[in-house]
A protein has these predicted regions:
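A short small-residue
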Residues: 4-8, 117-120, 153-161
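N-terminal beta1-alpha1-beta2 submodule of the flavodoxin-like/Rossmannoid cofactor-binding fold
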Residues: 1-103, 161, 172-221
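Short, solvent-exposed loop/turn segments at secondary-structure boundaries
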Residues: 17-19, 126-130, 163-167
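A structural signal for well-ordered alpha-helical scaffolds and beta->alpha junctions
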Residues: 65, 93, 131, 135-136, ...
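Well-ordered beta-strand positions
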Residues: 76-77, 112, 152
């Protein structure tokens, strides 16, 4: 069976004119260049309308998003692209992954993912704010999503004033990021098959705790 990576566009507006949509396209191209299948889930599209109805019960929310939840749980890996809204992921995206966590087996480890986050402010400035709030007792990872283990978080700052050349450069980086993500998964699989590393699944409570810590930010603007 072909390996499958699901790209989640977390922007509430699924328009192809949005920069998040362009980043998803670039990531998908990188995945396909490595021979993997790249599926796409639009949080702001018709596929997940119920996540915008915050007044509904969690049971109804879970039922109506069964298709989206199933696609997330069946993926070998995730890439989640979203804009920073009010200091965190958009509420609709958070609600979707709360439903994912409810649907997962309690003993199942979180799904590995790369996060790509766009924002209006400079990324380095925001990163310094994350560390400051973490020391004051607030949650250390503002990008935490239920059921997800973020292996890598990429911040793209100042998108509202970014030149066209810079935007295109970030699209190339997203393409390369996808290729590295696939290469890492393939390398881990080969080591396990050859016996170089004994497969070991960390307890769910431990991986969830790790996911809540300050994100591992590998690039910023």
């Amino acid at each position: 069976m072909d390996s499958r990576l699901l790209i989640v566009n977390g922007h509430p507006d699924p328009s192809s004119r949005r920069y998040c949509a362009a980043l998803c396209d670039a990531y998908a191209a990188g995945v396909k260049s490595r021979g993997w299948k790249a599926d796409r889930l639009e949080v702001g599209g018709a596929a997940t309308p119920a996540i915008l109805r915050a007044q509904e019960s969690c049971d109804v929310l879970l039922l109506r998003n069964e298709s989206a939840i199933g696609r997330i749980c069946d993926a070998d890996r995730l890439a989640i692209v979203f804009p920073l809204w009010l200091g965190a992921a958009p509420h609709a995206l958070q609600l979707l992954f709360e439903s994912v966590a409810q649907a997962m087996d309690p003993q199942q480890s979180p799904i590995a993912a790369d996060l790509v986050v766009t924002m209006d402010m400079p990324a380095l400035l925001y990163r310094s704010q994350i560390r400051t709030t973490g020391k004051s007792g607030a949650p250390r990872n503002p990008f935490y999503l239920n059921g997800v283990r973020a292996d890598q978080t990429t911040l793209i700052g100042s998108v509202n004033v970014m030149a066209r050349s810079e935007r295109e450069a970030w699209l190339l980086k997203a393409h390369a990021l996808a290729q590295r993500a696939v290469d890492r998964n393939v390398a881990v699989g080969r080591r396990s098959i050859l016996g170089w590393r004994v497969p070991f699944s960390m307890p769910a409570w431990f991986t969830q705790a790790i996911s809540r810590r300050e994100p591992r930010i590998v690039s910023g603007h």
